């Protein structure tokens, strides 16, 4: 009896260990209560459309929850386990997916991913099937983009491949990074890139830091001193950033909670978080309602149209827990394609600033191929205004409509627009006459969308015959020249701001930098560490802040 009891106890312990090991890869995140009030079109997740494919089959690997599935969607086979990647359309008219993968029979199973290869794959269709044509080299988490000089760049963790031609020779090299006295959050991996209007690049790293390179290949400089992600509990990874004709977009995944968050920005540096899930398991749905119920969706990338709108999402997916994907088993991973609702093309016709007192707002909805705004829209369903309003079913309602060529001009009652001085992309939500969701963003005609971006490095204290001096490097990472500004170095003491030094910053050309030498006040002690705040002002407007710990004359 004693032996049987000990055996049962030991068996229970093993089962608990297995259970803990399995479920340590997931946890349930509680959603904010107000998310229950979000309307259709509020969440980024509402933009996912039915998957496309022609070959629906169960004669393939995978758990029952992903069978049958479109085996001609994305890329998959029985030899390789594929993971993340993104698509670029070539001058040959074909779609080129650069994805990573490893042999399914690898002894470590899915945990072979650190030794993955980068595959160059092609397809005649945006959704696939993609077929590998060659291996570029070693690497994980690839993302392809085109630098200012026209060269193609495939980023991988800890490196990059560069080529003059998608089908040409690829040369391996390294990026240069300048943290500019800032802490690098969670290392430099899982990078994602978005091209700015002047062909410079903004990059986000795994930890949520924002970096800028003036051409995509030269040194990346960190601008932020903290992550731009939502201020919530989350194990964040897999950020993806892109820019369209309206604004910048960023999605980041909480891999443990299996929920992603969606953010928007006017300049790619300062971000606002939109409510609702960006994606989570269950978004891979067929037109008939069948779900390819993949266990995890990671490494989101987007394919963009000529306006920069995201029209397709590509995910790395796996049918089980990663550590349960073993060699020569029935589990594996692939890269899938899911079409996205790109949103409508909107133009605000009023040039005066919109306030709470604005009586009417005129918005033009542009016709596109396959879309007639004059006949396809349920006009009475439209709501327009700040995202904070329309996402919850509020906002401006329609007064009148008029046709202009093939386009539709909608006049909204300005009441309840919710647009403040900080707004940069008002939103439209509504329905088509067949009940499908529609949405779109518009620019405000009175706002400057390309502005200087001044950023300071840590102050350097020195002694001279004139006393204590403080030198601060300031650089303009914007695409346009800056006007004169004020730099101030200070610290907090007992709730009060103690000013250490301040001085004027001259006008700077794009990417130009200068050293500002300041006379420091007798309010700091040599060798003592302070929580310093370096602030750049234009008049009373705060342009940027940099918080750091630093000793004086260390």
Question: What name fits each language-model region?
Answer:
Residues 496-525:
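Intrinsically disordered, low-complexity Pro/Gly/Ser/Thr-rich segments with frequent PxxP/GP/PP motifs
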Residues 474-479:
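Asparagine-centered strand-capping/turn motif at beta-strand->loop junctions
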Residues 400-406, 505-514, 553:
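Short proline/glycine- and polar residue-rich coil/turn motifs
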Residues 2, 25-347:
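Carbohydrate-active catalytic/glycan-binding domains of CAZyme proteins
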Residues 415-420, 521-526:
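Short, surface-exposed loop/turn segments at beta-strand-coil junctions that are enriched for proline
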Residues 522-554:
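Terminal connector regions
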Residues 343-364, 451-459:
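Boundary/junction segments of secreted and surface-exposed precursor proteins
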Residues 1-26:
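Bacterial Sec-dependent N-terminal signal peptides
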């Amino acid at each position: 009896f004693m032996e049987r009891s000990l055996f049962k106890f030991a068996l229970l312990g093993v089962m608990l260990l297995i259970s803990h090991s399995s479920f340590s890869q997931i946890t349930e995140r509680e959603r904010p209560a107000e998310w229950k009030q979000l309307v259709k079109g509020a969440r980024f997740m509402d933009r996912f459309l039915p998957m496309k494919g022609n070959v629906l089959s169960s004669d393939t690997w995978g758990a029952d929850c992903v069978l049958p599935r479109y085996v001609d969607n994305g890329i998959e086979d029985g030899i390789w386990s594929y993971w993340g990647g993104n698509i670029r359309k070539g001058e040959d008219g074909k779609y080129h997916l650069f994805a990573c993968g490893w042999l399914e029979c690898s002894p470590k199973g899915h945990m072979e991913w650190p030794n993955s290869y980068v595959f160059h794959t092609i397809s005649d269709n945006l959704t696939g099937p993609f077929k590998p044509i060659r291996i570029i080299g070693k690497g994980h988490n690839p993302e392809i983009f085109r630098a200012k000089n026209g060269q193609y760049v495939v980023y991988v963790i800890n490196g990059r491949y560069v080529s003059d031609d998608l089908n040409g020779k690829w040369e391996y090299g390294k990026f240069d990074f300048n943290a500019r006295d800032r802490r690098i959050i969670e290392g430099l991996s899982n990078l994602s890139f978005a091209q700015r209007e002047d062909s410079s690049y903004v990059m986000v790293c795994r930890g949520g830091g924002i970096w800028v390179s003036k051409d995509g290949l030269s040194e990346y400089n960190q601008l932020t001193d903290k992550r731009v992600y939502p201020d919530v509990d989350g194990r964040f990874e897999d950020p993806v950033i892109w820019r369209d004709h309206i604004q910048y977009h960023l999605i980041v995944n909480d891999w443990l909670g299996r929920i992603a968050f969606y953010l928007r920005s006017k300049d790619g540096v300062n971000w606002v978080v939109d409510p609702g899930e960006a994606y989570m398991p269950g978004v891979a749905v067929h037109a008939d309602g069948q779900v390819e119920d993949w266990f995890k969706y990671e490494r989101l990338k987007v394919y963009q149209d000529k306006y920069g709108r995201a029209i397709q999402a590509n995910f790395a997916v796996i049918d089980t827990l990663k550590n349960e994907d073993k060699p020569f088993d029935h589990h594996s991973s692939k890269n899938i394609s899911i079409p996205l609702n790109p949103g409508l093309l909107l133009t605000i016709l009023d040039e005066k600033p919109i306030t709470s007192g604005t009586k009417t707002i005129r918005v033009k909805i542009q016709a596109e191929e396959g879309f007639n705004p004059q006949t396809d829209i349920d006009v009475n369903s439209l709501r327009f205004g700040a995202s904070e309003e329309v996402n919850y079913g509020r906002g401006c309602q329609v007064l009148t409509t008029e046709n202009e060529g093939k386009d539709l001009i909608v006049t909204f009652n300005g009441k309840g627009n919710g647009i403040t001085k900080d707004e940069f992309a008002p939103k439209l939500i509504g329905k088509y006459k067949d009940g499908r969701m529609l949405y779109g963003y518009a620019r405000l005609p009175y706002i400057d969308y390309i502005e200087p971006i001044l950023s300071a490095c840590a102050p350097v204290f020195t002694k001279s015959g004139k006393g204590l001096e403080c030198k601060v490097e300031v650089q303009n990472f914007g695409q346009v020249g800056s006007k004169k500004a004020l730099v101030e170095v200070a610290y907090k003491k007992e709730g009060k701001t103690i000013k250490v030094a301040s001085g004027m910053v001259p006008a700077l050309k794009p990417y130009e930098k200068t050293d500002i030498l300041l006379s420091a006040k007798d309010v700091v002690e040599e060798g003592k560490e302070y929580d310093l705040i370096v602030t750049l002002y234009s008049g009373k407007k705060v342009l940027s802040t940099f918080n750091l710990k630093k000793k004086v004359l260390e």
